[in-house]
Swiss-Prot record:
The gene is hemE. It is found in: Cytoplasm. Pathway: Porphyrin-containing compound metabolism; protoporphyrin-IX biosynthesis; coproporphyrinogen-III from 5-aminolevulinate: step 4/4. This is Uroporphyrinogen decarboxylase. PROSITE patterns: UROD_1, UROD_2. It comes from Teredinibacter turnerae (strain ATCC 39867 / T7901). One of its GO terms (molecular function) is uroporphyrinogen decarboxylase activity. GO terms for cellular component: cytosol. CDD domains: URO-D (cd00717).
Length: 354
């Protein structure tokens, strides 16, 4: 495999010295970029983009052609796993993802297959291989999956939800059915992430978008515990390199200490947690990734720069910080403002690494 030209993202995750704080953005390949919108139009629809390895590669690389980012992230969707389980994923304009065959009964859960990514998600693995080839060692490639709880919410609700009523009802009224569903998702996600690592992903992130919707103990039982099982089963070294694992629970600030005990390399933070406080709480056990509010990108470039400076100062000196947004970049952001954010991270962070 090609030697990495820029490995500061991987180095920061391992707490090794870096020259500047590395930066990438969740959803960096997305609708805020005109070139992404053009490629998506060629693909016909979102799933047409996800399932075409050449086009998925094209949009993965677009932000790197525009900005000096320190990592690429595979262009895909967390719902590829339930789609491969037979739920029939489709997208309705203005309404987001939907499933034709939601899972709501014990019989439906029992009938669900465990995903074999090599057989059922070859288009994702082909995209990983294509992207790695095209990157040619420029920066590392991040693979990802949704967390079992987050995937379960979409599968049970049949799409997005504001209150997760059906999913939570299953947790509390039929916990054994919920556990069986989560167990199948643990096996599927573990297989999927390991397949991405074998295909060339140099780090992986577990997106737990809806863990923060759970009660304190319910999070530990139904979200963190399944993620712990995945972490235990992941390939952690491949082709002579450590494979870092990042765990990101949106709204997960109250559980940082428990998350840091899972054996992951890093925790993603949303914008509601102070990163300096988080650093004190995890005590060097894990690196931290985050955590600017994506809405700051609507402000002036000088205000963006000020907020970047504030977060860097809060984290303080030394490695172990990967700068990112606290959630995905939103479609209406001016690409110039995204560039100002990335440049500010590199320019303002150098003094923290001397």
């Amino acid at each position: 495999m090609t030697e990495l030209k820029n490995d500061r993202f991987l180095r920061a995750l391992q707490g090794q010295p870096v020259d500047v704080t590395p930066v990438w953005m969740m959803r960096q390949a997305g609708r805020y970029l005109p070139e992404y919108r053009a490629t998506r139009a060629r693909a016909g629809d979102f799933m047409g983009l996800c399932t075409n390895p050449q086009l998925a590669c094209e949009v993965t690389l677009q932000p790197l052609q525009r900005y000096p980012l320190d990592a690429a992230i595979l262009f895909s969707d967390i719902l590829t796993v339930p789609d491969a389980m037979g739920l029939g994923l489709y997208f309705e304009t203005g309404e987001g993802p939907k499933f034709r065959n939601p899972v709501r009964t014990a019989a439906q859960v029992e009938a669900l297959p465990v995903v074999n990514a090599e057989n059922e998600l070859t288009y994702v693995l082909d995209a990983v291989k294509t992207i790695r080839h095209e990157l040619n060692g420029a920066v590392p490639l991040i693979g990802f999956s949704g967390s079992p709880w987050t995937l379960m919410t979409y599968m049970v609700e049949g799409g997005s939800s504001k209150d997760f009523r059906r999913s939570k009802a299953m947790l509390y009224s039929e916990p054994e059915v919920a556990r069986l569903l989560l167990d199948k998702l643990v096996a599927s996600v573990t297989d999927y992430l390991n397949a991405q690592i074998r295909a060339g992903a140099q780090a992986v992130q577990i997106f737990d978008s809806w863990g923060g919707a759970l009660a304190h103990d319910a999070y530990l039982e139904f979200s963190l515990k399944p993620m712990q099982q995945i972490v235990n089963g992941l390939i952690r070294e491949h082709q002579g390199r450590q494979v870092p694992v990042i765990l990101f629970t949106k709204g997960g600030g109250q559980w940082l200490e428990a998350m840091a005990e899972t054996g992951v390399t890093a925790l993603g933070l949303d914008w509601t947690t102070d990163i300096g406080n988080a650093r004190e709480r995890v005590g060097g056990k894990v690196a931290l990734q985050g955590n600017m509010d994506p809405s700051v990108l609507y402000a002036s470039t000088s205000a963006i720069r000020d907020e970047v400076g504030r977060i860097l100062a809060s984290y303080g000196h030394g490695s172990g910080h990967v700068f990112n947004l606290g959630h995905g970049i939103t479609p209406e952001v001016d690409p110039v403002h995204a560039g100002a954010f990335i440049n500010a991270v590199h320019e303002l962070s150098a003094g923290y690494h001397q």
